Structures are given as structure tokens and as C-alpha cells.
Regions:
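Signal-transmission linkers at sensory-effector interfaces
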Residues: 1-25, 36, 127, 158-165
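Short beta-strand-to-loop transition segments that serve as allosteric relay/switch motifs
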Residues: 63, 129-138
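Allosteric cytosolic regulatory segments
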Residues: 149-157
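Short regulatory alpha-helical segment in sensory/regulatory domains of signaling proteins that mediates
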Residues: 14-21, 30-39, 45-49, 65, ...
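Short hydrophobic/glycine-rich mini-motifs in sensory/regulatory modules
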Residues: 120-130
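Catalytic cores of carbohydrate-active enzymes across secretory and cytosolic contexts
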Residues: 166-862
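A short, aliphatic-rich beta-strand micro-motif
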Residues: 113-121
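Regulatory sensory and allosteric helical modules in signal-transduction proteins
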Residues: 48, 54-58, 65-103
Length: 862
């Protein structure tokens, strides 16, 4: 570099440092300038942490930016550590051959060879290290060293300013709150780690709620923690990524869903399971809806979600001394949720009302940001106090509010949907309100308006048994829909026909699923087998299928995420619904994959032990019992997980049908097996509670005491630990009663293997080598015979296939056959059963055609 260039560069750096911007942003700009002027591929600034024994990456151009604030090295590690340790410049032409070279694969360092680092010193105090690197070997001369040293002197001043927290804390606080108010943080591992690091103990106690955490933490504590942990760079980087995410126009949706931009999809669901800190879900349906809108956000699908706000949510579960389920309902503090009033087109908070024969239902409307998606929640005090609580009268009022109220809320906000997607029949009344609006707006009769609205309706059914569909008597229908029926200009009989099956005669029951099927142009089941079952249940109705999937960033463990980053490419998550991305799984070293899995398994076991102890202490159990529970489960034993709703058809107790066989398995000294169970029974499901009690009793049986654990109060958090840490996921419903199931899909992403009846999604996923099957798919009309056959098949596959394969190790101690199956399950199923693929299917096969974007017709099976 010439003297003139040197002077110009120093002048430019001086200009940047004097602009008065935020220190972290200035530092980013300076390293970018240095890389350009030095013609290097990388320029990075590492700051000395307060303990003065570690460096942390604070700014970089060339390395992976997600490593800012995350990549740390001790002063005795690497070449950068050597610069700080010896407080002198270090120049190496071929860094990979130097004895102090340390490889950081997460930073993408494998491409860079030459290294020049100089200390950052301000007023005689070491602040950090400034580094440049190139992809080709290069010898840095005295002039290069002098030039970078001069630049470092100016950069050190910026670093000193960055450490002056008075100038830094206001934007940090502001950005922390901006991150907390959008649930995007819940599926961004780096942002989650920021909130956790602020106060790990309180974070866990608050059920991972950043709004509550920030409300409790005094400003001084935030300042102290941010300074101690060097969080500033991480916070700024997380905020910047959030803003880039929210405002990017280079998305899948921008290319494929443009027709939905002026008139978005209105997605209705009775529950949404987005995160454990927002407890308005009970189980699979809600978690699926949460995953649906997260992937819609990631893909940038124009969509607005509509649900209900349950102030007491679903119940908190605890078991009494006999193992019987008890339910507690807790009132949610609205101020501790990322909610704000929805604002209407008139600039005022939205309030809606619905007339019934027995009075007016009034509701407020809240808005929650879920990435790019608005989630609107209608709140009507007692009507929406509890999810799935109350009698038929409460239920119909909730569904009236969800459907009719949801459409009116959209209208009040100036939103005109181009597509109405009903996730199950609970929101079916929305179509009637949409018809009324079309009649009013365009001067049409009911019969004229129906075809127009029907074309825009997508209906998803999740229930494979007739008894599972909501039905209401004629009196309840007339009481609650009478005024709407009057506005539609139809008779009571005509309205009842819309929800009645043929041949029901005068004993009319209004079925919400029938309403959804009759008033939708496109209807789908949620797996291939469920499509077959649904078409048999509703003969003559063209029901296709779109198989459910799960949101990858939500359910994938951070350790596995980093593993995929290294082997699938840094942007693999942007294309997780494409099969080609997952081929790289085969390139992962067996040992690396296995060690990652064992780490997650250890984390699960520690979590289960803590919960088991907490449960025992709450019940007042003896110190001896508590001590025993602190040691439950072995990290070396084959660990099988089962977690889901405790409905009797899911047969949580199938494994108990032959206690002698089960006992021999769990107590085998050479090849032991252990089980972790979790799940809730519906408060009115006494048989389901009985099954749960059977499972819980094994924790007190000496033969099974340390091999069977029931984790109380199953929620998204418990589910996350289980699906990320188990070796095997057990699923044994009575075929064909499982519409899809998604918990096993979450296990796939983390390398666990499914052991399942060929029902729901597993019927189309299993290929003989990517997991294990219970039976061959045969059923029997006699329930006891059916269960006996399946239990025998379960014991057989455990004894003959699962257990031997897990414990078969090579000379390195690795279960190569098991790992081969792990890789196959990830490679063959990771792309097929994730929510990105699912939402892309809905968009191309239902949303775009429903909005008039294509002329394609829905086939029976799509």
C-alpha cells in the first residue's frame, strides 16, 4: 500500500470514528473499510472480555456474521489469542501450518490461509485484537504491519467508547424490547440465548418469557450483565437479522405467492401453539397451527391468523399421590405477553359485536407479531376464559366468536381476505359471515353469493372418527345464528341443511365439519391414509390430502442446527423443504453425529431429573424418594419417549400389556431400556386419566422405579427436550385413528428414530430402513384382538430389531448400524415432513388457485 493510500485509509477511518454513530455499527463499518483497503478477504475485531482471559468476536467482514458475540477463544488459543497474549503483531503467510493455529469451523475459517493480527491498545490498555486474513498465502511486510497498527490505534478508541455503557445501553434496551415483542425470537436460537444469558435461573422460572424478564430486570442489572458477557454485539446482530428478516423481499413467497399480496389468506384456528410462554394451546392441533404460521412467515406468505385469547389457557397438570391427574387454571397476565390492541382502519382499537337471540357478544381484538405474520386473538372474558372448557353452549359461542367475529375483525382492520383457510371445523361460521358480507357489498342473494365465497374457502379436517366432529342441536343453532340467518335471508331448515348429513331426518344435529365440506371448494385431510379414511367417512366429497409437517427452526436443537450449518451449507434452512439440501447428511462424520446426539440425550436426562425432583417435592415425598429421583435414567441406556394427549385410542399403556416382558427389557443388565412419558388427558376424559395413572404408577414400582418417568405438565418446552434427546420415539395409536401426528417428525430432525404403528404420517414415511414399524398395518374389528396383536408386534420389534441394533458397537464404541439409520431418517424425511414443504403445498395447491391466481382444479388427492 502506497503512502498516499495509507494516509487516505487512516483519514477514512478517522472520519468513520468521528461520525458519532453507535460504536458497534462504527466498528462494523471500520472492519469493512480495512478489508477493502488492505485487499484482504477478512477483517475481524476481537474484544477482550472483562475477565481479560478471553477474546470474543465483535465485528467481522468475511467470517460468518452469526458468530459475532458467539465465537470466543482464550488467550492461549489460536493466532489471535497469541497477539493478545504477547501484545505484539503476528504475521503468518500459511496460518494453517502454524502450531498456534486453531480451526473454528463454525466461523468458516477453512478458506483462509494468511494471517496478520495486531493488538488494539488505547491509552496503554489492551482492548482486543485486529485481524486480516486472505484465502491465498501472502507475506505481510513491515509496511502492512505498520499500516494495520496505525489503523488499530484508531479502532481501539472506538472499542473504548463501546465499553462506555452510558452511550450503549439505551439502544440495547430498546433493541431487547424490539426482539421480545415479536415471537420471531422464539425460533432464533441466538436470540433465545441472549435472553437466557441475562438471567439463566429467572429465565427458566418465567417459562422463557422475555417480556416478563425484561420487566423485572432493573436497568442497572441489564447494564451489568451486558457488560460482563459482552452482549452488545450479539444484541445488535440479532436485531439487525430480525430487521433484515422482516423487510427482505427476496423470499419464496415473493416469487410464488404474489397474487395473495393485496388479499391475503385468513387462517382460522381455535388454538395456536407458538411458544410455551403464550399458553393458548392444548396439543397437536394448536402446535401445528403455530408451526403453520411460522413457516408462512419464513416463506413470506401473505397471511393473517385468527384465533381466540383464552385468559386461563389450557390447564396446568399435576398428579396427586395416587397418580391421578389434577387440573389447575391460572389467569394470564396480559401485560406479560407481547400483545397490543389491534387497530382498525379508523385508527381506533378494534372491538366487535355479534347479535344472538339471547343477547350481544362483545369482544376485544389483540394483535401479536409472529415474524411477518399478524396473529389476531379475540377476547370476550368468560366466553373465552378456557380452551375447550364448558358445555355445548360455551363451545358454540366460542366458535361463533372465532368464525363470525374473526371475519368482522378483519373487516374492521381494513383487511379483505382472498382466501379463507379453516383449520378444522371450529371456525366454520366464518364462511356464513363472508357470504353475508358478499351479499351486502355486491347486492347478491344468498344463492348467488355462495359460489363466489365457496371458491375462496380451504377446509382442513383433522378428525378421522365421526364422534370427534363438533355437533350442535337445532335450538342452540337458532339461538346463536338466528340474527345472522335473518341477514342471509334463509330459513332455519335451510341453515340446518348446511350442517346436516343426508338422511338425518328430523333429529338434526348441525355438524361443523359438514358445514366446512359443503361451503369449501377445496378440502383436505392431513396425511395420505387420513385422506382415504376421510373419503370413506364422507363419500362423494372430493377430499385430498396435504400431509402435516413441523417448523424446523422451532424443533431442531441448536447443536444439531450448527451441525447442519457445517455440512449442509450456511443457508440450508432457507431451502429445508427441498430434498437436495438434505443429501449432505451422509457427509457428517458418524462420531460427530453420535456425540451430538449423546449431548442432547444428557441434556434431556438432566431435565427429567430436575422435573422429577420438583414433582416429588411438591407432593411432599420423603428425602429418600427425592434422592432416588435425582438419579433416574442412565445416559447409557436405550431411551424411549412417548408424549402426546392421553386419549385412549393412542394407547399409552400398550407397552404394559405384558409386564413380565417389559420388566425383563428394562432390567437387562447388558442391554437396558428406559422410558420417559408425558401428556395430558382431557379434564372430562376419565378413561384417559386412568391410562395416565397406570403409567405414573410404574414410577413407584421397585421393578421400574428408575426406568420409567412421567414428566408432568406437558407443554412445548417439555416436548422440545423430549424430541431432541430420545433415542426412539414410540407411537402406537389404533390404526387408522391417528390423522397424522407430528411429534415423530420433530424427532426425525434431531436424529431420533421412530417406532410406530403404520398410521398417520408414518404410513407414508416408513421405508423399512429409516425407523421401525409396529406390525404391518392390519386391523381387527375386535378392539382387544387388535391391541393384543399390536402389543405382541411391539415387543417383537423391540426385542429383535431395536435393542440389538442400538447396542451393537464397533471397536470405536459407535453403533454404526444405528447411526446409518439415523442418517437415513434425516435424509429421507427431513424435507418431506417439515412445515415449509407443507405451507408451500398449501400455497401452490390451494391458496393461489382459491385466490384466482391459477385456473388449476383441485384433484381428489393432491
Amino acid at each position: 500500500m502506497s503512502d498516499a493510500s495509507r494516509v487516505l485509509t487512516l483519514d477514512e477511518i478517522s472520519h468513520l470514528t468521528q461520525e458519532g454513530g453507535k460504536p458497534a455499527e462504527t466498528l462494523m463499518n471500520v472492519v469493512a473499510l480495512i478489508a477493502k483497503r488492505f485487499q484482504t478477504d477478512v477483517c475481524s475485531a476481537y474484544l477482550l472480555e472483562p475477565d481479560r482471559t478471553n477474546l470474543v468476536l465483535a465485528a467481522t467482514l468475511g467470517l460468518r456474521r452469526e458468530c459475532v458475540g458467539m465465537l470466543r477463544l482464550a488467550l492461549n488459543e489460536g493466532l489471535a489469542g497469541m497477539v493478545a497474549e504477547q501484545v505484539r503483531p503476528v504475521a503468518v503467510a500459511e496460518a494453517t501450518k502454524h502450531p498456534r493455529f486453531k480451526f473454528f469451523p463454525e466461523a468458516g475459517e477453512e478458506k483462509y490461509h494468511s494471517f496478520l493480527g495486531v493488538p488494539l491498545i488505547d491509552r496503554g490498555v489492551l482492548q482486543g485484537v485486529l485481524v486480516v486474513q486472505t484465502t491465498e498465502p501472502r507475506t505481510f511486510g513491515e509496511q502492512d504491519i505498520r499500516m494495520l497498527t496505525d489503523a488499530a490505534a484508531q479502532v481501539a478508541n472506538v472499542v473504548s467508547e463501546a465499553r462506555t455503557l452510558e452511550k450503549f445501553i439505551a439502544p440495547v434496551q430498546e433493541r431487547l424490547w424490539a426482539l421480545a415483542r415479536n415471537l420471531w425470537w422464539s425460533w432464533d436460537h441466538d436470540t433465545v440465548s441472549i435472553f437466557r444469558d441475562l438471567d439463566p435461573v429467572r429465565w427458566a422460572q418465567l417459562n422463557h418469557n422475555p417480556i416478563t424478564l425484561l420487566s423485572e430486570l432493573p436497568l442497572a442489572d441489564v447494564e451489568r450483565r451486558a457488560g460482563e458477557l459482552m452482549l452488545h454485539g450479539r444484541i445488535n446482530y440479532a436485531y439487525r437479522r430480525q430487521q433484515e428478516y422482516l423487510h427482505s423481499d427476496r423470499t419464496w413467497g415473493a416469487t410464488h405467492a404474489g397474487v395473495l399480496r393485496p388479499r391475503p389468506v385468513a387462517y382460522f384456528s381455535a388454538e395456536f401453539g407458538v411458544h410455551e410462554s403464550l399458553p393458548i394451546y392444548s396439543g397437536g392441533l394448536g402446535v401445528l397451527a403455530g408451526d403453520h404460521i411460522k413457516s408462512a412467515s419464513d416463506l413470506d406468505i401473505p397471511l393473517v391468523a385468527i384465533g381466540l385469547f383464552y385468559r386461563e389457557g389450557y390447564f396446568k397438570q399435576r398428579l396427586d399421590a395416587s397418580g391421578w391427574q389434577q387440573e389447575d387454571y391460572l389467569l394470564t397476565d396480559l401485560s406479560k405477553l407481547p400483545m397490543e390492541p389491534a387497530i382498525g382502519a379508523d385508527g381506533l382499537p378494534v372491538n366487535i359485536q355479534i347479535e344472538t337471540r339471547s343477547g350481544v357478544i362483545r369482544a376485544k381484538v389483540w394483535r401479536i407479531k409472529v415474524g411477518r405474520i399478524d396473529l389476531l386473538l379475540l377476547d370476550s372474558d368468560e366466553i373465552t376464559s378456557r380452551l375447550y372448557g364448558g358445555d355445548g353452549r360455551v363451545r358454540i359461542r366460542q366458535e361463533l366468536l372465532l368464525g363470525v367475529g374473526g371475519v368482522r375483525a378483519l373487516r374492521a382492520m381494513g383487511i379483505t381476505p382472498g382466501v379463507f383457510h379453516m383449520n378444522e371445523g371450529h371456525s366454520g361460521f366464518a364462511v356464513l359471515e363472508a357470504i353475508r358480507e358478499r351479499m351486502y357489498d355486491e347486492g347478491l342473494t344468498f344463492d348467488q353469493a355462495v359460489p363466489y365465497v365457496k371458491q375462496e374457502v380451504v377446509f382442513t379436517t383433522h378428525t378421522p372418527v365421526p364422534a370427534g366432529h363438533d355437533r350442535f342441536g337445532a335450538d342452540l343453532i337458532e339461538e346463536h345464528l338466528g340474527p345472522l340467518r335473518d341477514a342471509l335471508g334463509i330459513s332455519h331448515e335451510r341453515l340446518m341443511e348446511l350442517g346436516s348429513e343426508a338422511g338425518e331426518g328430523h333429529q338434526w344435529q348441525f355438524c361443523m365439519t359438514v358445514l366446512g365440506l359443503k361451503l369449501s371448494r377445496r378440502a383436505n385431510a392431513v396425511s395420505s391414509l387420513h385422506g382415504v379414511v376421510s373419503r370413506a367417512m364422507w363419500p362423494g366429497v372430493p377430499i385430498g390430502h396435504i400431509t402435516n409437517g413441523v417448523h424446523v427452526p422451532t424443533w431442531l436443537a441448536p447443536q444439531m442446527y450448527r451441525l447442519y450449518d457445517r455440512h449442509l451449507g450456511a443457508d440450508w434452512h432457507l431451502h429445508s423443504g427441498e430434498s437436495r439440501i438434505w443429501e449432505g447428511i451422509e457427509n457428517i462424520d458418524d462420531g460427530e453425529l453420535w456425540e451430538t446426539h449423546l449431548s442432547l440425550k444428557s441434556t434431556l436426562i438432566q431435565f427429567v431429573r430436575r422435573r422429577a425432583v420438583d414433582q416429588a417435592e411438591r407432593r411432599g415425598e420423603s428425602p429418600e424418594s427425592i434422592q432416588r429421583l435425582s438419579r433416574v435414567l442412565s445416559p447409557d441406556a436405550l431411551t424411549i419417549g412417548f408424549a402426546r394427549r392421553f386419549a385412549t385410542y393412542k394407547r399409552a399403556n400398550l407397552i404394559l400389556r405384558d409386564i413380565e416382558k417389559l420388566g425383563s427389557m428394562v432390567n437387562d443388565p447388558k442391554r437396558p431400556v428406559q422410558f420417559v412419558f408425558a401428556g395430558k388427558a382431557h379434564p372430562r376424559d376419565e378413561p384417559g386419566k386412568g391410562v395416565l395413572q397406570e403409567i405414573a404408577a410404574l414410577m413407584r414400582d421397585r421393578q421400574f422405579a428408575e426406568k420409567f418417568v412421567f414428566v408432568e405438565d406437558y407443554d412445548i418446552n417439555v416436548g422440545r427436550f423430549l424430541v431432541q434427546g430420545v433415542d426412539v420415539w414410540l407411537n402406537n395409536p389404533r390404526r387408522p385413528l391417528e390423522a397424522s401426528g407430528t411429534s415423530g417428525q420433530k424427532v426425525v430432525l434431531n436424529g431420533g428414530l421412530n417406532l410406530s404403528v403404520l398410521d398417520g404420517w408414518w404410513a407414508e414415511a416408513y421405508d423399512g430402513l429409516n425407523g421401525f414399524a409396529i406390525g404391518t398395518g392390519r386391523t381387527h374389528s375386535n378392539m382387544d384382538v387388535h391391541d393384543t396383536r399390536d402389543s405382541e408386534a411391539l415387543y417383537r420389534v423391540l426385542h429383535d430389531e431395536v435393542i440389538p441394533l442400538y447396542y451393537q458397537r464397533d471397536r470405536d464404541g459407535l453403533p454404526r448400524g444405528w447411526i446409518k439409520r439415523m442418517k437415513r431418517t434425516i435424509r429421507t424425511l427431513g424435507w418431506r415432513f417439515n412445515a415449509d414443504r407443507m405451507v408451500m403445498d398449501y400455497t401452490l395447491k390451494t391458496y393461489v388457485p382459491a385466490a384466482g391466481g391459477t385456473s388449476s382444479e383441485m384433484r381428489q388427492a393432491f
